[in-house]
Every structure is written in structure tokens, then in C-alpha cells.
Amino acid sequence: GCIGRNESQKKDNVYKFKE
């Protein structure tokens, strides 16, 4: 996921990165 994001946004980015 992206660094420097809020927890909720960080998790959302992690899911997008994994996909």
C-alpha cells in the first residue's frame, strides 16, 4: 500500500496494490 495515508485509505490502497 501507499505510505503517508490514513489507516482506512492505506488498507484500501493495499487491496488495490494486491489486485
Swiss-Prot record:
At the top level of its lineage, which domain of life is listed? Answer: Eukaryota
| GO CC, one annotated term | extracellular region
Which tissues express it?
A: Expressed by the venom gland.
Q: Which UniProt keywords apply?
A: Calcium channel impairing toxin, Ion channel impairing toxin, Neurotoxin, Secreted, Toxin, Voltage-gated calcium channel impairing toxin
UniProt-annotated location(s): Secreted
A single Gene Ontology MF term assigned here is: toxin activity
State where it is primarily located.
Answer: secreted
Described by its record, this protein's role is as follows: Antagonist of L-type calcium channels (Cav1/CACNA1).
Protein name as it appears in the record: U7-ctenitoxin-Pn1b
Source taxonomy: Eukaryota, Metazoa, Ecdysozoa, Arthropoda, Chelicerata
